[in-house]
Amino acid sequence: MKSYRKELWFNVSKRREYINITPAVEECLLESGIKEGILLCNAMHITASVFINDDERGLHNDFEEWLQGLAPEKPYSRYRHNDTGEDNADAHLKRSIMGREVVVAVTSGKLDFEPWEQIFYGEFDGKRRKRVLVKIIGE
């Protein structure tokens, strides 16, 4: 059994942003040489998420509105976490809702997806350099 690990680094220009990382993850799979196995992809930041969904702008806007309705950024004073001097309690809650990681089957050297599935990095407290871990195990 083989194992492959790589960190993907990128800059996030906005506080909240959804980035399609599927091409970078597929490149990792190609580099790994693994044809059958499991791929794990997780956010390496406590205020970010990795999730699978459709790459459609309207849906991304729906995510943004829905998450802002559940955990609005402001007023900062509404969150106990922000009493510590932070201003990102909403980002922690959004991450809890959207999840930390995805696990995808690898079949015949490809991500075993249906046609519309894509892997996204969801950032909820950005404007700086961020990273994602890709771990692939298989043969």
PLM region spans:
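Active-site histidine-anchored catalytic micro-motif
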Residues: 1-139
